[in-house]
Amino acid sequence: MNLIISTMLLILTNQYSIETPNYKLVKKYKNFEIRDYEEMIVAHTKIKRTFRESNSTGFRRIANYIFGGNDKSMEIAMTAPVLTKFPSDINSNIFEVSFVMPKEHNLKSLPSPDLETVSISERQLGRVAVFKFGGWATENRTKYYIDQLINSLKKERIDAVGDIMVAQYNSPWVMPPFRKNEIIIAIK
C-alpha cells in the first residue's frame, strides 16, 4: 500500500515540475478562462490520419527530435503540454502535433531535426479561451469539450477566431483521474 501511495505522489509531483508556457490569466469564467500567452518556440509535425493515430505518430516524431534525432545529437528537455491542432477544414483529417521547446532555447540554439516531417518555428497563441478537463483526451471526449467551450463562448458573446487545439499535460502512465487536459481556442 505504501508503494502505491508513494508512486501516486511521485507521478503527481512530477507532472507539476515540468516546464509549461508562460501566460497571463485575463479573466476567469464559470466554465473557462481567458489567457494571453507569450510567444513560444515549438517543434511541430503534420499528420494525415485519425486523431488518435496523429497524436501517436506526431508524438513519436517529435520525441525522436528531442531525444537526439537532430543535427547536433542534442537532447532537449521535455515540456508540457503536447498540443494537437484540429484541422481548420472539418472534412480534413490533417492534424498538427507540437511540443513547446524549453524557454532556455531560441531558434538559433535549437538543432535542426533529422526528420524532414518535423519543423521548428515561433508560435504566438495570443489571446485564447481555455476549457480544462480530466481523463483521457480521446477524439470523442475532445470534440464534446470543444462544443462545450464554443457554447460557453457564445453565451458570453466572445468570438472564436482561430485554431482549436487540445493540450495534454501528462505522460501516458498517469491515471485518468489525475490527468490534465485543456481545449484552447483563439478569440478576439
Feature locations, PLM:
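A solvent-exposed interaction/effector surface
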Residues: N2-K188
